[in-house]
Amino acid sequence: SGGGDGSGMWFGPRL
């Protein structure tokens, strides 16, 4: 988790 795809990234549905 990190505001991204749920893997601690920053790229995904929560861009």
Swiss-Prot record:
UniProt GO cellular component terms: extracellular region
Entry annotated with the keyword Secreted: yes
GO MF term list: neuropeptide hormone activity
Cystines in this chain: none
Leader peptide range in chain numbering: none
Keywords of this entry: Amidation, Neuropeptide, Secreted
Coiled coil: none
Principal location listed in the UniProt entry: secreted
InterPro entries per the UniProt record, alphabetical: Pyrokinin_CS
Subcellular location: Secreted
GO terms, biological process: neuropeptide signaling pathway
Residues where Leucine amide is found: L15
Family: Belongs to the pyrokinin family.
Function: Myoactive.
Descriptive protein name: CAPA-Pyrokinin
Source organism (scientific name): Karoophasma botterkloofense
